[in-house]
Amino acid sequence: MPAIESSFLHAKVNLLLKLADSPAQLVQELTQFYESYADLTFQAGLFTVKAGDLPAYHNPALMNRELETAFIKTSAQEPQKALEIIDLLAGRHQLEPRQLACAMLGHLPAEYFPQVAERLAAWARAVEEPEDLVWMFKRGTALMRQQAPEQWLELLQTWLESDNPANHRVAVYGLTSMINDASLTSLPLIYKHLKPLMLECSTKTLPQLETILERLIEKSENETVFFIKQLLGQSKNPILTRLVRRSLPLFSTAAQESLRSHLRTL
């Protein structure tokens, strides 16, 4: 892999952005740029790349950062042009252009959030590796999670309630990525959307809810214990009780005893 000089990199990225009116040409030139600085000596196992199973160019980190910083500005300033570029990048097989597409998608303005959700849903259903879903949702919902978290949570709730098992898997990883990224102050919003699903949980949704509950415990055990006690006080659903009992080993000893004591009062 040839070394890349920062002034050349900056100039090259600016030249690429001048092709924004010709998305196909831009992506063609960008692909050649990726290929020119690919690490052909990379061997799996020498160092870790959180990339699922997608083939990767293994370009210099500086190059990927510079491209992402520049291209997300196009998303903010010229969103319609950015969408065309995003769709072409997402059609590539390699990791780097797909991650760039997700980063651009995640910085489209609020009026484009419906298009953001539509693309993420389509892309996610075609992904096999959980690791790829994690970075896809983290990058692709960056602005939506900041400006309209409820809109994103409503979509995840719809997927979780769907009759399509593929949507359940997508919803779990979407919600997991949001929980992992959430501040403690935003957890109540997540609990709000989970509440009806937990109260009406069934054998169909039980595995997905177990995974989500595990992530919530890791994020904030105390908040999650309080949330579960509220649920148990509002529902006689035996599946919910089973879910809580099966999840007890995930809690600390003190939290387990607190929940067992609460269960005995029901």
Describe every region a protein language model picked out.
Residues Q43, Q77-D87, A110-A122, Q146-T158, ...:
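Amphipathic alpha-helical scaffolding segments comprising HEAT/armadillo-like alpha-solenoid repeats
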Residues L88-D132:
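Hydrophobic alpha-helical segments and helix pairs
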Residues L189, H193, K204-I212, E223, ...:
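Short amphipathic alpha-helical segments
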